[in-house]
């Protein structure tokens, strides 16, 4: 009895957690999938309605705009977070003075919630309170910076706030990767006459492929589920110019009481995340098996 208990103790300890996760996460994913094939309104209906909700979803102008906004946000968010993160990581990798202080400053935004970040940037970008008012008070009376209330430019305010919060996290990943490279590799390159730019561009950064992949997956995941940042910063406006799928999903469910349509949008988001996560997990498993 005691031998059996000792052998199976890890499984016994993990069983409640696995059961709860299976029920409250994957169980509700399956429930949402089922509801997306019904004509549910305020309350769930369990009679199947086929792909009607998905047809209705992709015929919705608001949904199509939210998808376009997501593509724009994700592309810019990825590029700027990775580029800025790499630059900051290389800067700190020079073992400068006050590295600990600078690392804390760069990482501090990541400690904030997106609600706090969105609220802060809403004040900064507000034409009557923030940057525009500051420059006007300095005497630049013709200066305008009204992106927050401009339909064409509002989406870029979300990019600015998102990059400000997440670039430090990417920096931490790349800095850890750079610090894990053996010093002999860098010393050998310098002996061969390689300059600092060549060392990073042709030697160190190509070795950071796993860090690139990890950063890509995490940032795409953050962008797809973006909700609180948008609610705090623009609430999807002006109009619907900054609406994204996560905001569309909640508004459809709780404001319009169309549970089936909301479930369909949730499943589209789930598939988008899965399309990014599954290749990453496959790559990691292959690398583990190759060792």
Predicted regions and their residues:
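A structural signal for multi-pass alpha-helical bundles of membrane permease subunits
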Residues: 2-291
